[in-house]
Amino acid sequence: MAGAGPTMLLREENGCCSRRQSSSSAGDSDGEQEDSPATRARQQLEALLNKTMRIRMTDGRTLVGCFLCTDRDCNVILGSAQEFLKPSDSFSAGEPRVLGLAMVPGHHIVSIEVQRESLSGGPYL
């Protein structure tokens, strides 16, 4: 794509993702092609950044918060997170506990739902 202008690429180094600008569209220097499965997966994750998510955990708790990042172990960081205990717990009485910034271990995640942008249909995908 000649003349397409600079693009933002993500590069993973030592377990961390960093952005860099590139003026070529031939792929990055590691041989990862622009339409490779890894690139498509990364783009899908980028599209979810700052979206509200509901994460169900193995112990029955549910966390709702803003998706900030993930890592290679599938751990998820949520901002402005709230914790909802399982309904059978009489102490919780359905009220959320405000956590703020929360790290959810990947091996404890049962399901992840992303809140829809529009109000049509259900609130989560």
Curated annotation (Swiss-Prot):
Localization (cell): Cytoplasm; Nucleus
Outline what the protein does. Answer: Auxillary component of the N-terminal acetyltransferase C (NatC) complex which catalyzes acetylation of N-terminal methionine residues. N-terminal acetylation protects proteins from ubiquitination and degradation by the N-end rule pathway.
Which sequence positions carry the modification called N-acetylalanine? 2
TM stretches of this protein: none
Q: Where is the composition biased (Low complexity)?
A: 18-28
Name the gene for this chain: Naa38
Which segments constitute the Sm domain?
40-118
Entry's family note = Belongs to the snRNP Sm proteins family.
Which region ranges are annotated with the description Disordered?
Answer: 1-42
In terms of SUPFAM superfamilies, this protein maps to: Sm-like ribonucleoproteins (SSF50182)
Tell me what this protein is called.
Answer: N-alpha-acetyltransferase 38, NatC auxiliary subunit
Gene Ontology MF annotations: RNA binding
What processes does the entry annotate via GO biological process terms?
A: negative regulation of apoptotic process
The GO cellular component terms are:
cytoplasm; NatC complex; nucleoplasm; nucleus
Classification of source organism: Eukaryota, Metazoa, Chordata, Craniata, Vertebrata
Chief place of localization:
cytoplasm
What are the protein's UniProt keywords?
Acetylation, Cytoplasm, Nucleus, Phosphoprotein
Phosphoserine is carried by which residues?
A: 22, 25, 29
Q: Could you give the subunit structure recorded for this chain?
A: Component of the N-terminal acetyltransferase C (NatC) complex, which is composed of NAA35, NAA38 and NAA30.
